[in-house]
Amino acid sequence: MMNLFFSFMFCMMCSSLVGASEGPLVKLNNGVQYQGKTEHDGDSFRGIRYGQSPEGVLRFAPPLMYAPPTDGIIDATKLGHVCPQSSCTNTGCSEDCLLLNIFTGKNATIQAVDSGNLLPVAIFVHGGSYMSGSGNLYPGGPLVNFMDGKGIVVTINYRLGALGFLGSSQLRAVDCTYGSTANMRI
């Protein structure tokens, strides 16, 4: 999964050369393509799935890796669902929320990689006492600007409350490592 993540990050840096009028198009080594969005402070890829939807029988199960389709282009221009929480009163909340957002600065280009300079990557995990919040609330563009536009910011949505941090003997029987829904693995 980490190789896929870093491949995606590298391809995002290359994306400024492709599809400038419609936003960046990234093609990973495994054939998966993501259509991003160009904004005033850089490029963004939003609502990228990193785990299978934890609905139904997977509700309290440890997260499972997601295998994206390799045909077609995945729209990564819109924010995904927020994980259920007490403050959710709109239709933007869903258990299908294991999503992340990736932002690159306008100075994060292929030239930086070609010259052997690695770009900094900041992974922002929101707070909220494991009960509330979302990576969608934090725009990555301003955070990238703190790196002079030469970096990458990742924000993440993760299961909250009992759906993400419930512990019990029944769950321990399924996954003795954590005895919970295993958000700690993500």
Model-predicted segments: where are they?
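Classical eukaryotic N-terminal signal peptides for Sec-dependent ER targeting/secretion
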Residues: 1-12
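Non-catalytic accessory segments of hydrolases
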Residues: 14-179
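Extended, hydrophobic alpha-helical segments in both membrane/secreted and soluble proteins
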Residues: 183-186
